[in-house]
Regions:
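Short, Lys/Arg-enriched N-terminal segments with co-localized hydrophobic residues
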Residues: 1-5
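Residue-level signature of transmembrane alpha-helical entry/exit and packing/kink sites
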Residues: 7, 11, 43-44
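Residue-level signal for the membrane-embedded core of alpha-helical transmembrane segments
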Residues: 12, 16, 110-117
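Hydrophobic core segments of alpha-helical transmembrane domains in multi-pass membrane transport
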Residues: 16-24, 47-55, 117-121
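Loop-to-helix transition at the N-terminal end of transmembrane alpha-helices
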Residues: 33-52
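Mid-chain, well-packed structural core segment of small domains
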Residues: 60-95
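Individual transmembrane alpha-helices with interfacial aromatic-anchor signatures
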Residues: 99-115
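Juxtamembrane boundary at the C-terminal end of a transmembrane helix
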Residues: 120-130
Length: 130
């Protein structure tokens, strides 16, 4: 049970550190003149790019071994889910390797996320006209 508690603590701390880094990027982009929403978008894009880079360098997996869900839940985990299969299957070529396998993990998330947004958008639209 003690190991399980430590896993929770490590996931919480590392996931929190990822969020702190994202907030630092947001603050920096804001200080450089971007509006709040644009700064948040730029910070998210930066985190995605950094996590894809760390995945390609095989560093992200080492972090994830210690952090567990702390690296999977933030947006960085989604970037890792797309980049990892792309790196793994690059030897099979760009079309049948990278292109075909890149969304094996993230594809269902995209499909169901899009479907849910359509349903919620329709419900919101109905709510606004009633």
């Amino acid at each position: 049970e003690r190991d399980e508690i430590m896993e929770f603590v490590k996931a919480f701390v590392i996931g929190g550190l990822i969020c702190v880094v994202g907030q630092i990027f947001t603050n920096c982009y804001g200080a450089w003149g971007l509006e709040k929403q644009d700064a948040g978008t730029a910070a998210s894009m930066t985190l995605v790019a950094l996590s894809a880079l760390l995945t390609g360098l095989s560093v992200y997996d080492d972090i994830a071994k210690h952090a567990g869900a702390g690296t999977l839940v933030p947006i960085t985990g989604f970037a890792n889910a797309i980049a990892a299969p792309a790196v793994e299957f690059k030897t099979e070529g760009f079309v049948l390797g990278v292109g075909a396998k890149m969304f094996t993990i993230a594809g269902p998330v995209i499909v169901y996320g899009l479907a849910a947004s359509v349903v919620y958008g329709f419900i919101y639209w109905l709510y606004t006209i009633l």
